[in-house]
Amino acid sequence: MSKRDYYEVLGVERGATEADLKKAYRRLAMKYHPDRNPGDKESEDKFKEANEAYEVLSDASKRAAFDQYGHAGVDPSMGGGGAGFGGANFSDIFGDVFSDFFGGGGRGGGRGGAQRGSDLRYTLELNLEEAVRGTTVSIRVPTLVNCQPCDGSGAKKGSTPSTCPTCGGIGQVRMQQGFFSVQQTCPRCHGQGKIITDPCTSCHGEGRVEEYKTLSVKVPAGVDTGDRIRLSGEGEAGTHGGPTGDLYVVISVREHEIFQRDGKHLYCEVPISYTDAALGGELEVPTLDGRVKLKIPEGTQTGKQFRLRGKGVAPVRGGGAGDLLCRVAVETPVNLSRRQRELLEELRDSLEGDSSHSPKASGWFDGVKRFFGDL
C-alpha cells in the first residue's frame, strides 16, 4: 500500500510554516490518540501516520529531501534518511497534547499547583564613566504583583474558594489509559483542589495585577555591556502562593566620544601636529581621572601607540586596572599662509634626495625597485 503525501496527511499546504505544522499535528494527535480511541485500529494507524508525517516535515533537512524526492528521500528502505521517532524531539508538542487531554498532568507536571513567578529582564543604559566608577540608579519596571483586595487568592473579598467537584478537593483525578489507571492533575482546578465561584473584581480571578515598581539599583564599578545584576524576589509574583521571580538588570554601556573599551583596557586616538611629530613635544591627553601629560619623541609616526599604565578600568570581578592606549594620528597642515608654504617648500627641497629622513619611504621604494626588477 502506497504512503500518502505527508502534507496531505497533516492537511497543510506545501509552504506551511513550522507553527502551521505543529498546529495541524496537535489537532490530529488529539483526535486519534489511542487513549481516546481504545481498540480502534484505524485511529491508531492514523495516529502513527500523523507522527511520521510530522517527524519528517518538522525537520528542515528531512523536509527538503521529501520536497525534492518524495518518500524515496526519507524512507530508509529506498536509501533515504528514514522517518520514525529516532531523529525528532516530540517533548514540547506531546506536552501540549497531554496538557489539553489530561488537564495539565502530562510530562513534567503540567500547570497545577503553586508556581514561581516569572523572572524579568530590564536593560539599563549607562555612560562609560558610570560603568567604570559605579553608580546607583532608580528604575521603573512593569511587573505583576499580588492583588491586594483578594490577597492573591483570586476570590472576591468575603468569599472563599469552593471545593472542586471534579476531584473532590484532592487536585488529582484518575484516568483510564488502556489497561492502566493513571493519576493526573485535575483539569478543572489545575491541581488546587479549589475553584473560584465568586472572582475578585480587581484582578478578575487571576490573583495578580499589573503594576509599575520603582527600584534602586546599585551598580558596582567596572561593569561592562552584557553584565547582569540579579535582584532576588523583584520579578513577577507567583501564583497560588508560589514564590516571586527575580529581576535581572542587564547592563548596556553607551559609546563614548573619546574612548573605546575592550575589557579592562581603554583606547583613544590622539591627533598631533606635523611639527610636534617631527620635533617632539609634550601634550595633555584625557583620562577618566583627568588630564595627564604625554611626551612625544621626535620622529613619531602615525599609528604609534603609547601606553598609560593603570589608566584603564578596574574589572568588576577583581584584579588590577587596565591601561589606556593612545594611538597617535599625525595631522597634515591645511589652510597654509604664503610664508608657511614657502617654509615647507624649503624643507622639502632640503630633504630631497636624503632617504635617511624617511625610513619607511626608503624601505618602500627599495621594495618597489626589487618588485619591478623581478618582472
From Swiss-Prot:
Participates actively in the response to hyperosmotic and heat shock by preventing the aggregation of stress-denatured proteins and by disaggregating proteins, also in an autonomous, DnaK-independent fashion. Unfolded proteins bind initially to DnaJ; upon interaction with the DnaJ-bound protein, DnaK hydrolyzes its bound ATP, resulting in the formation of a stable complex. GrpE releases ADP from DnaK; ATP binding to DnaK triggers the release of the substrate protein, thus completing the reaction cycle. Homodimer. One of its GO terms (cellular component) is cytoplasm. Residues 5-70 form the J domain. The lineage of its organism: Bacteria, Pseudomonadati, Pseudomonadota, Gammaproteobacteria, Pseudomonadales. Binds 2 Zn(2+) ions per monomer. One of its GO terms (molecular function) is heat shock protein binding. CDD domains: DnaJ, DnaJ_C, DnaJ_zf. The J domain is necessary and sufficient to stimulate DnaK ATPase activity. Zinc center 1 plays an important role in the autonomous, DnaK-independent chaperone activity of DnaJ. Zinc center 2 is essential for interaction with DnaK and for DnaJ activity. InterPro entries: DnaJ, DnaJ_C, DnaJ_domain, DnaJ_domain_CS, HSP40/DnaJ_pept-bd, HSP_DnaJ_Cys-rich_dom, HSP_DnaJ_Cys-rich_dom_sf, J_dom_sf. The keyword Mitochondrion does not apply. The keyword Amino-acid biosynthesis does not apply. Belongs to the DnaJ family. It holds the Pfam family DnaJ_CXXCXGXG. It comes from the Bacteria. PANTHER family: CHAPERONE PROTEIN DNAJ, DNAJ HOMOLOG 1, MITOCHONDRIAL-RELATED. Zn(2+) 1 binds at residues 147, 150, 200, 203. Zn(2+) 2 binds at residues 164, 167, 186, 189. This is Chaperone protein DnaJ. Its cofactor is Zn(2+). It comes from Pseudomonas putida (strain ATCC 47054 / DSM 6125 / CFBP 8728 / NCIMB 11950 / KT2440). CXXCXGXG motif repeats lie at residues 147-154, 164-171, 186-193, 200-207. It is found in: Cytoplasm. One of its GO terms (biological process) is protein refolding. A zinc finger (CR-type) spans 134-212. Keywords: Chaperone, Cytoplasm, DNA replication, Metal-binding, Repeat, Stress response, Zinc, Zinc-finger. The gene is dnaJ. SUPFAM superfamilies: Chaperone J-domain, DnaJ/Hsp40 cysteine-rich domain, HSP40/DnaJ peptide-binding domain.
